[in-house]
Amino acid sequence: MTAVQIIDDLVARPGEGKALLDAYMADYAPGARARGMVLDRVLVSPPLWMDDQPNTLTIVWNVEGAAGWWGMRLAAGADPSATAFWETAGARLVSRARRFAAAPEDVETLCNG
Amino acid sequence: MAKFTALITLQPGADRAAFARNIGDTTLAQPTLPGVFDGGDLILHRQVANEAVPSDAAIAHIDSAVYEPIGGGAHEPGLRNGVYRCLLLAVKPGTPEATVRQFESETLAMPHYIGTIRNWRLSRVTKASGARVWTHVWEQEYADIGGLLGPYMTNPYHWARVDRWFDPECPEWIVDTRLCHSFCAFERSVLNP
């Protein structure tokens, strides 16, 4: 099976980076794990908590191939807490992006099923 | 030229095949295949904007649209004995026009990446009824059901690119989560006969 990464890039309002990450881990991560997502890593940029400028949090999850991705997606669709978290988190966010990626050596496998 | 599609849900126990046979002048009137999602029991399609559906006590619900094509193409005109798939979707009111156009453009690029889509058409709805005020109809034809349930679903262009418009967890989300995903077998191509 081929690993697919689900990457959340969160740009926190100044002074909100640590609280945003704490909320993500407390209120979002347990549901994500229940939907089959496996936490790969969390990065904080720059690597200090700033009170007057935005921190960017990069949170990387893994799922297994397209089947794992759809499993996650359909489970999230049936779980109102997934979207509820993003609505609540909006107050601490400047912006965010969610991206889906894989290692270059896995691209052909993913494209050819 | 305007088109019309209706996804007809029948009362429990109604004879789908008999209803389809008696529905009158249509381009397509076929029972849906297993796996549809809010896709009804029958797909009725006309190449003209005749939205009349015979009144029948067997009908429980109809999702339908009259629509004008904005793009499409054919890799296999004249396809026979394939599978027709229809997605009715509703873009959220207030979505900026430029965003809608980007969504449409990316959707129309799906056949470039997903080879099992043999013929396709994307349309804007001019008259809708049913569970939502449908704004778009995304139709495709496949040589067989495997092309829809396999590569269409598993190709990364679908789930890692286009799906973000449909996903409430993505900031780009614009499409109401209530969709009609329906498909049926056909003898002669609906989109490019």
Predicted regions located by residue number:
Chain B
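Outer-membrane beta-barrel domain signature
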Residues: 158-167, 171-172, 176
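Short S/T/G/P-rich N-terminal loop/turn motif that feeds into the first structured element of a domain
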Residues: 1-157, 177-193
